[in-house]
Structures are given as C-alpha cells and as structure tokens.
Amino acid sequence: MSETGQRESVRPSPIFLGLLGLTAVGGALAWLAGETVQPLAYAGVFVMVIAGWLVSLCLHEFGHAFTAWRFGDHDVAVRGYLTLDPRRYSHPMLSLGLPMLFIALGGIGLPGAAVYVHTWFMTTARRTLVSLAGPTVNLALAMLLLAATRLLFDPIHAVLWAGVAFLAFLQLTALVLNLLPIPGLDGYAALEPHLRPETQRALAPAKQFALVFRLVLFLAPTLNGWFFGVVYWLFDLSGVSHRLAAAGSVLARFWSIWF
C-alpha cells in the first residue's frame, strides 16, 4: 500500500467525527445545567455518555486493528478498521446495539464484537499485544477522564463531572470484563498464544458462549458483586468518589428512577 493509501486508511470517518461532536454537545448541555438536576441535565449527560461510549468502542477496536496493522496485518486497512467507522465492525448489533442495552439495564460497559485480525503469522508476544491493545485503550481513557475530574471538578458544574465520572466508570467495567481469561474475551486471547495447541483446540468451541458468560455475570448476584467490587476499587484509586459516578449513572439512565 502506498504512503497516500495508508494515510487514507487511518483517516477518521465522518461518522466517528460526528460522534465526537455529539459527545461535545452533550457535555455542553451538561455544563449549562450547572449543579441543578433538571431536564437539561438528564439530556446532556445521556447524550454525552452514550455518544462518548460509542467513541470509546471505536477507539477500542481501533487499538486492536492498528496494533495488528503495525505488526503486519495490512488487511485491516482494506477492511476499513483504521477509519474508526463503527459500520466496519464485524457485527453492528453485537458491537453497538448490545453494549448500549447493557448500559441501559445495568450500567456495564460491555465490549463490542471484536474486529477480525490476522495474527497467525505473528510471534506469540505480538499476538498478545494485539489482544491487549483494546483494553489498554479503555484504561487510558479511564485514566484521562478520572484525572480531568480529579483536577478540574467544580461543584458549580457537578452535572458535567458526574457524567464524566460515569463514563470513566464504564471504561473500567470494560477493562475488567475484557481482561477476564474467558474464551471469547481479550484476556483469554492474550493468553491463548501461550497455551499448548491441544488446549487451544479444546477451548475454541467455548468462545461462542462468551455472550452467555456476560449475561451470567450480569444476572448472578455473587459474580455481579465481585465484578463491581473490583471496578469500584480501581475507581477509588483515582481519588474521585464513586458516588459521583453513581450520580452520573442516574442522570444517564434517568428511566431507572421510575423502573
């Protein structure tokens, strides 16, 4: 691929730029709401969190694709994975629709369906790095959002910072969930190259049940409590109170007040 073609392949799509703009609009509305819980506050935080989460999904998948591209899988550019266009993902419902549903129901940042990358020719270490690239993006976003909240929080604009804290919380839920060594998740994909071939073959069929595990994690009280306990612990390391994220969750999921 020519240098010009490479630049075209990594150029952000208009849809991704639109999602960034929508996130900014939601943030502006939340800023204007100040510290008052009013319809503008609900609308602003809802738009900011949903659009912001879609942006993070794009960046997560871009992390996988760009790392694979750097290690020699140039087909990811042909498939459009480097454009940050959500339409290029393997399955729109699993990549976008299901994560939105999980946020609506339980405030969990569910990872989307993974992009298809070719790693068979890579070294074991590089295959692991490709798998960890997506969760690394979630970690970086969480740190950025929490640092901004810690340093810039202003009670007069508490609505905005509650939304930012909740968006950071979602990044941490995605990080913890993704790093679990469960077939079908990034954590297992990072370990898989280090397993014996017969072990890989034996566990391969379990990958199709990754969604079932996510549902069990969501519905089983013990597993759910353990999962959120880890997330809250990581969140509190930032020095930002998780109560702020809880307030953001209520604003973003405003229907939970009545249902």
Curated annotation (Swiss-Prot):
Residues holding Zn(2+): 60, 64
Cellular compartments annotated: Cell membrane
Cofactor note: Binds 1 zinc ion per subunit.
Entry's transmembrane regions: 14-34, 39-59, 97-117, 128-148, 156-176, 215-235
Example of a GO cellular component annotation carried by this entry: plasma membrane
Consequences of knocking out this gene: Not essential. No effect on processing of anti-sigma factors RsdA, RskA, RslA or RsmA.
Biological process annotations from GO: proteolysis
Domain of life: Bacteria
Required cofactor names: Zn(2+)
CDD domains the UniProt entry points to: S2P-M50_like_1
UniProt membrane topology term: Multi-pass membrane protein
Similarity remark: Belongs to the peptidase M50B family.
The protein's name in its UniProt record: Putative zinc metalloprotease Rip2
